[in-house]
Amino acid sequence: MSPATITLLFLLFAIVMFVWEKIPLGVTSMIICVGLVVTGVLDFKTAFAGFIDSNVILFVAMFIVGGALFETGMANKIGGIVTHFAKTERQLIIAIMVIVGLMSGVLSNTGTAAVLIPVVIGIAARSGYSRSRLLMPLVFAAAMGGNLSLIGAPGNLIAQSVMEEMDMSFSFFEYAKVGLPILICGIIYFAFIGYKFLPDKSGEKDSSYDEQKDFSNVPKWKQALSLIILVLTLLGMIFEEQIGIKLCITGCIGALALILTGVISEKNALKSIDLKTIFLFGGTLSLASALQTTGAGEDIAKTVIGVLGENPSPYVLTFVVFMLCCILTNFMSNTATTALMAPICVSIAQGMG
């Protein structure tokens, strides 16, 4: 069996397991990574290169930087302050979407949602509004806000890693060129139309999210310093070219500063790292390498281009890829979809010249 065929079989396995999710996504990725070595498709060094990728290091660092903001209660406080000024339900929906969208752009969108869900539930209880009508806009804003920057969502960095293999990359806020208009349109939609269709579920049962964490014992200096270090870290990333320090190193400096100053303990710093994302990221990069080195990605690209006819329009091809990703992401996570589609899309682009 040729290396290209083996790679395509692993790709099929990945699609099935990512949709089925009977075993964790990270474990599936590691099975693929190890399998590519055992079958001789990739050598050990190439297969596991994804785990020392600069974007994985950036992931780890920003998990800690974001974790400090969550651990100290600063994220909670920011959310509470902004929503405090909203007087009506519609104003509250807009305020929630603005703060969640912006925070998701510079922190983990999943982490932002998890931290602000109890805040919003508390606001709903105090104001008498239905929590379901406030939580749905929060989730949408977190998803849209993740597309404001390179670090907003795991999929963004996966695409960055694939681009870097071709000596190309996205700048820190390049995603915002598309992500910001989407977020703004989403907020406007909910403000004028969407709020009418939000579910109003009465008799909502208590959940683990009803219990808000008490941050009153956290020193004010820790909260302030966590925010200051986050801002300085982001500024360092924005001005990467001017200061000559790579994004991952800037992130590491921010993470180390938080640990050394005692803002976050080493134990909590390690706890804030999402290992599932790291394993998914590192493992699927080995599949991306195999698709490229064996020519399997090129075969897929030729098939797709062939189906669309000779010299297909780039706009048509973009639409097809867009719709395919939209369909896939309803059956598997956004991160898994990006991990599968990014190398294939690159092969298609190269095939079209």
Annotate each predicted stretch with a short phrase:
Residues 27, 34, 38-130, 272-277, ...:
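Membrane-embedded alpha-helical segments and adjacent helix-loop junctions characteristic
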Residues 1-2, 73, 88, 156, ...:
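Short, structured coil/loop segments at alpha-helix boundaries
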Residues 14-23, 99-109, 140-151, 236-242, ...:
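Transmembrane alpha-helix interface/packing and boundary motifs in multi-pass membrane proteins
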Residues 6, 127-140, 146-158, 162-216, ...:
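Juxtamembrane and boundary regions of transmembrane helices in multi-pass small-molecule transporters
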